Amino acid sequence: HVQVVNKPQFLKSDGLEGLPVQIIALPWVSRSGLMASLELSGEDPGKVYEELENRLSDLVKNWLDDADPNLPMILTAHASVEGAKYGSERMVMLGKDLVLPPALVKNKRLDYVALGHIHKPQNLNEGSHPPAIYPGSIERVDFGEINDKKYYILAEITKGKTDVTWKE
């Protein structure tokens, strides 16, 4: 099953053809678009980023409160997370990213967190639940990644427990 979203959404089981799972989907959010939609244009940039991050955190918290406690909950996010380690792609990124707080991706009500945007493979919640994983990019963006191993993830997700296998 594949579903593409262009704005933050909470996808419940009935919207996923009855699949026994719930997904909070956070696609790449452009700062300028989000600022305009939240009527924050012209504000101090530091204040704007803080407000955007707070509003996104509140949105996710509200969706978690509305979730079915009996079904697994997955968070997918194309975003940076505070504390994540960047690979060589950092050199090609311009501007300040919208940054998610670590507490958001380590929330125990989540069963798996699938992250994209940062190319360095890493689990931001190593040894704890939920796994919060950047598998890295399967494509190299420049010669700085020529010797980097590339991975994908197999995740067996059940409510309260997720088994993750890194595949090269």
Pin down the residues of each PLM region.
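Extended recognition/assembly regions associated with phosphoester-bond processing machinery
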Residues: 1-168
